[in-house]
A protein has these predicted regions:
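Active-site entrance/lid segments in N-terminal catalytic domains of soluble metabolic enzymes
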Residues: 2-13, 18-130
Length: 130
């Protein structure tokens, strides 16, 4: 079998397939399912200390965009992109972080990496989350 390993910013990843921060990485259960498929890694849903930012997830927006990146009206054309903005982790950091830790432990058995994602509205929040 071919060696698909990549080195990204000093992090060795067994293959270049990474499940990014979206619904597939919304919780530990989903991240583990991604890892089970053989991905090289997962990027956990962004966690934040801001309740207002977490509420964005409840107002997710999905759109079909045509080749000119315009929102499709009516029939979806043959060439299109599915664009989504789904927000952040629903739980506050103290509830979401244990799910990331659980996923990191699970990922070790599959030689997969788990990458965290954080957001805050203040410098102090960024420092505390990091």
């Amino acid at each position: 079998m071919a060696n698909l390993e990549v080195n990204f910013c000093g992090v060795k990843i067994k293959n270049p397939i990474v499940a990014s921060s979206a619904e597939p990485t919304l919780n530990a259960h989903n991240m583990k399912k991604c890892i089970d498929t053989g991905v090289g890694g997962v990027i956990a849903k962004t966690m934040t200390d801001s309740e207002a930012m977490r509420e964005l997830t409840t107002r997710s927006k999905w759109r079909f965009l045509n080749e000119r990146h315009e929102v499709c009206q009516g029939k979806v054309p043959r060439c299109f992109s599915l664009y989504g903005r789904s927000g952040l982790a629903l739980e506050p950091p103290e509830e979401f972080l244990p799910q990331i830790v659980e996923t990191v432990e699970y990922a070790k058995d599959y030689d997969a990496v788990v990458i965290g994602s954080i957001a805050s509205t203040a410098l102090e929040g960024w420092v505390e989350l990091a």
